Amino acid sequence: MNQLTNLSPADLSAQHEQDAKDLTRILPASTKVYIQGSRPDIQVPMRQIALTDTPTGLGGEKNPPVMVYDTSGVYTDPEVAIDLNKGLPHVRQAWIEERQDTDVLDTLSSSFGQERLKDIRTADIRFAHIQKPRRAKTGQNVTQMHYAKKGMITPEMEYIAIRENQRQRDEVDMRQHAGQNFGAKNLTEITPEFVRQEVAAGRAIIPANINHPEIEPMIIGRNFLVKINANIGNSALGSSIDEEVSKMTWATRWGADTIMDLSTGKNIHETREWIIRNSPVPIGTVPIYQALEKVDGVAEDLTWEIFKDTLIEQAEQGVDYFTIHAGVLLRYVPLTANRLTGIVSRGGSIMAQWCLAHHEENFLYTHFDEICEIMKAYDVSFSLGDGLRPGCIQDANDEAQFGELRTLGELTHRAWEHDVQVMIEGPGHVPMHMIKENMDLQLEVCKEAPFYTLGPLTTDIAPGYDHITSAIGAAMIGWYGTAMLCYVTPKEHLGLPNKKDVKDGIITYKIAAHAADLAKGHPGAQVRDNALSKARFEFRWDDQFNLSLDPDTARSMHDETLPKEAHKSAHFCSMCGPKFCSMKITQNVRNYAQNQETAKDFNPSTEEVEQGLKSMKQAYHDNGQKLYQKV
């Protein structure tokens, strides 16, 4: 595949146009709508799914459109001209500027960033419209947590409140089960003030670097909708800049709330710039990966100075959250010796190797307060990495894993002293009966800071299907209180995922996250389920497809056996056929009941009941003793 920057503007336009056509095909009956907040520049995007009317024979009524959360950015707005060479509109630029607490720098602060900018070998692959970076003014703190603690409701917080409510209205079916929330808060409406309170308390984060004005603000916390993250990134074995940008736009179209760029191959700096400039969602990274590349992959040669420069480099590009493995302490490393699979985290193994080589404490831990100073100058959130997570179910919940978790709790408090936002990463591989212990301990030692887990995988026997083995654990831990789920693709443990794998992983994790919202009893979570169930009962096939997470797949599976357009209005599917459709039979029962006298007006005697039963028995035999009759 060609490098993205080798494509002409016309090629890029044609590529986007084709992508847009594909999206219209796979998300039919959907319209991009914007809900305005208290000011004209707060325009919150949502996807509105139009529904057809209920057939006259089934009651005949209008079905209101269903509003759903949308992460696709302006890529799905037909009114916006997309130019990947220029990047996305700067949604937050005015909000950042009006706070008057940042400076625009003359040039990049990091040594490596300056080197790449001057390197003529990167000229052909470099993003052409790099803006000068921002940094907090001396003595200022620009984090959303700092604003929240001061009592400020920022435009980002108002935006999020509107977005979380999904504009659910009285005319949609709001019935739902109460759920069990394990101590979480279920409000009937999310307000900007509630968002502020949750961020101030550390129970939620708004990952929003001041150098990433393109993002549409979102929130991660257990009292909000469960979010999902998608991992992308190149490796030494392959992938190009255009492939990674394409994966990012593809992932956000299917519902990824955040993206992690885990690139470890060539041109990491340039790849990340292209992704950030074109991403409507927060971008996370693992800075130690790039720092390791700077020392040619020799972990022992890592230094605090190299890592610090990498943090500043990425913060000035606009990375919204960093995974930092500061909890991998020297004393925990020997605890992994008897594990079946040892240390499986790349970041964890890098820091463990450094600690053993120098027999010194992890420099990410000893320099943690200095890291906080960098984070609060750009509003980069911590994603405190679980470098000692279990890599198989045999190693689940051991002393090394939980020792690190307690250290992450300590570091959370230290970050909060700087008003830096924090979420905590979790496992991993954990059998079902041991999952809740992880959630309970995390809530206790990290004081309800958002939990962000990779699955967990509930069994190790299904390579090629680990998106399923992990989604089981993800749904459970999401119900218990995890705020964001890191997706797993079918390629997990096997290879670098392609676009199809990315889609499969996201759809699987959207199911897990939504199931968790239902189980928690999150207000409005059941609206889409109710609408789809009603469409199914009324044989509105197109509405069923359009309301599903993957309309294209649902429609194609239906059409494999019933391809004709007339089948879209048929009162049966190929599973049961026309005679044995339970939905159709139930409709017949309803019609029969409506034509009979009500119990209020009809009180038959015992003799009348017996006579009625005899009559129905005779009718059954007269009709050939068939359970279902032709209608």
UniProtKB/Swiss-Prot annotation:
Q: Which GO terms describe its cellular component?
A: cytosol
Transmembrane parts of this sequence: none
- Coiled coil start-end: none
Q: Does the keyword S-adenosyl-L-methionine apply?
A: yes
Q: Please name the pathway.
A: Cofactor biosynthesis; thiamine diphosphate biosynthesis
Which positions in this protein are listed as binding substrate?
Answer: N231, M260, Y289, H325, S345, R346, G347, D386, G387, L388, R389, E425, Y452
Task: Give the cofactors, semicolon-separated.
Answer: [4Fe-4S] cluster
The UniProt catalytic activity note for this protein reads: 5-amino-1-(5-phospho-beta-D-ribosyl)imidazole + S-adenosyl-L-methionine = 4-amino-2-methyl-5-(phosphooxymethyl)pyrimidine + CO + 5'-deoxyadenosine + formate + L-methionine + 3 H(+)
| EC identifiers of the protein | 4.1.99.17
Which residues are recorded as binding Zn(2+)?
H429, H493
Q: How is the cofactor bound?
A: Binds 1 [4Fe-4S] cluster per subunit. The cluster is coordinated with 3 cysteines and an exchangeable S-adenosyl-L-methionine.
Q: What UniProt keywords are attached to this protein's entry?
A: 4Fe-4S, Iron, Iron-sulfur, Lyase, Metal-binding, S-adenosyl-L-methionine, Thiamine biosynthesis, Zinc
Q: Name one GO molecular function term.
A: 4 iron, 4 sulfur cluster binding
Q: At which positions is [4Fe-4S] cluster bound? A: C573, C576, C581
A Pfam entry, by short name: ThiC-associated
Cite the InterPro entries for this sequence.
ThiC, ThiC-associated_dom, ThiC/Bza_core_dom, ThiC/BzaA/B
Q: Which GO terms describe its biological process?
A: thiamine biosynthetic process; thiamine diphosphate biosynthetic process
Q: What do we know about how this protein assembles, alone or with others?
A: Homodimer.
Question: HAMAP family, per this entry?
Answer: ThiC (MF_00089)
* Family per record: Belongs to the ThiC family.
The protein's job, in short, is:
Catalyzes the synthesis of the hydroxymethylpyrimidine phosphate (HMP-P) moiety of thiamine from aminoimidazole ribotide (AIR) in a radical S-adenosyl-L-methionine (SAM)-dependent reaction.
Name of protein: Phosphomethylpyrimidine synthase
Organism listed in the record: Acinetobacter baylyi (strain ATCC 33305 / BD413 / ADP1)
